[in-house]
């Protein structure tokens, strides 16, 4: 017997898809399978749990049982999918199997942990489950090393500093947020972190970790070392593609899908952090919301392509928040930076003086929506 639409995953992407399907069809069979508890929480909250004094269980917004009852679902929590037989249209776990009409992969992404000696001592904060496993160590830690100065690393550095901890942030790049914007734009946040007491080790490399009687010894390049109580890897995410690969689907950085969120198999779709949409991996909330709306229509028989507008990315650093949009990482842009006491507006323009990207901060973030309208689609 078919289980109708089967979704592997229970995170933000899966839940958005369920809600959009149920707005249009209250009765089509929906089955969700995931390795976690399937309780709902807001993942961006993980960047602020330490300063807010929150435990992992405090993040739960809705239990799996409440979710199943509200949306008429068959849920299989704490269940590891081991294989997908795409030809037979069957999903398999160790003790069960599910026939599907359509299958959606919403398997997310896992935190990348640098392959250095002692890497098992590094913690990750990519899920409620991961935070639950290390919350006592993080709460008790006085000295924290954050590896990676990107979006998540910068958010965590500020949060741990606000909680009164001694924070060191290390990154290979010459500036923070290097994959998102040039140093002349990120320098305002970088300066604020330094003012708060974050010790920035830029153009630096972690070479290994070793447990000691009094903490963890981190060995760095140039014959340097520091001792800390906890080390957090914030070095990016890697789309979870193992199941898709075993099913014979086309994989690049993520699970390759077209504008209809369809994989190389006509009955299998991918959504969220695991998906690579026409060559782009977009692990942000707004593209996932828009993708879920389109995919719900397509699963119910419509033929709707995904069209993504210019979208804001929010960096949640409360002492100096930032919004950005457009091709901020383009190397050929000229940046026009206007800095005032109440904030910054940085405009990235091309050779024809066309706005291609912008970054705004603090009280000037209200200018973002006007700038967004002038970006090319």
Swiss-Prot record:
It holds the Pfam family Pyr_redox_2. One of at least two accessory proteins for anaerobic nitric oxide (NO) reductase. Reduces the rubredoxin moiety of NO reductase. Pathway: Nitrogen metabolism; nitric oxide reduction. Transmembrane segments: none annotated. InterPro entries: FAD-bd_OxRdtase, FAD/NAD-bd_sf, FAD/NAD-binding_dom, NO_rdtase_NorW, Rbx-bd. The keyword Oxidoreductase applies. The gene is norW. Keywords: Cytoplasm, FAD, Flavoprotein, NAD, Oxidoreductase. The lineage of its organism: Bacteria, Pseudomonadati, Pseudomonadota, Gammaproteobacteria, Enterobacterales. This is Nitric oxide reductase FlRd-NAD(+) reductase. HAMAP family: NorW.
């Amino acid at each position: 017997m078919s289980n109708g639409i089967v979704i592997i995953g229970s995170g933000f992407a899966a839940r958005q898809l369920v809600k959009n399907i149920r707005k249009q069809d209250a009765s089509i069979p929906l089955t969700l399978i995931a390795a976690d508890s399937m309780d709902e929480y807001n993942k961006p909250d993980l960047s602020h749990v330490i300063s807010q004094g929150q435990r992992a269980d405090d993040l739960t917004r809705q239990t799996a049982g409440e979710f199943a009852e509200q949306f008429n679902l068959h849920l299989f929590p704490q269940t590891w999918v081991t294989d997908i037989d795409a030809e037979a249209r069957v999903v398999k776990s160790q003790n069960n199997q599910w026939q599907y009409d359509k299958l959606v992969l919403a398997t997310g992404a896992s935190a990348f942990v640098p392959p250095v000696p002692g890497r098992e001592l590094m913690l990750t904060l990519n899920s409620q489950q991961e935070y639950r496993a290390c919350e006592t160590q993080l709460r008790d830690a006085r000295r924290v090393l954050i590896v990676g100065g990107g979006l998540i690393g910068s958010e965590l550095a500020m949060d741990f500093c606000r909680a009164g901890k001694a924070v060191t942030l290390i990154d290979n790049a010459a500036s923070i947020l290097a994959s998102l914007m040039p140093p002349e734009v990120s320098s305002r946040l970088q300066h604020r972190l330094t003012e708060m007491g974050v010790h920035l080790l830029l153009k630096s490399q972690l070479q290994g970790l070793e447990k000691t009687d009094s903490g963890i010894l981190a060995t760095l390049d140039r014959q340097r070392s520091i001792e800390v109580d906890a080390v957090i890897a914030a070095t990016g995410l890697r789309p979870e593609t193992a199941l898709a690969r075993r099913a014979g689907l086309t994989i690049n950085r993520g699970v390759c899908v077209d504008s209809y969120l369809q994989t190389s198999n006509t009955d299998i779709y991918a959504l969220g952090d695991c998906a690579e949409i026409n060559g782009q991996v977009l692990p942000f909330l707004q593209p996932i919301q828009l993708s879920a709306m389109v995919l719900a229509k397509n699963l119910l028989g419509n033929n709707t392509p995904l069209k993504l507008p210019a979208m804001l990315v929010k960096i949640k650093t409360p002492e100096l928040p930032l919004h950005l949009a457009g091709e901020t990482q383009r190397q050929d842009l000229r940046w026009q930076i206007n800095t005032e006491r109440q904030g910054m507006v940085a405009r990235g323009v091309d050779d024809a003086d066309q706005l291609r990207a912008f970054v705004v901060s603090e009280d000037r973030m209200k200018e973002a929506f006007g700038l967004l309208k002038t970006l090319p689609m």
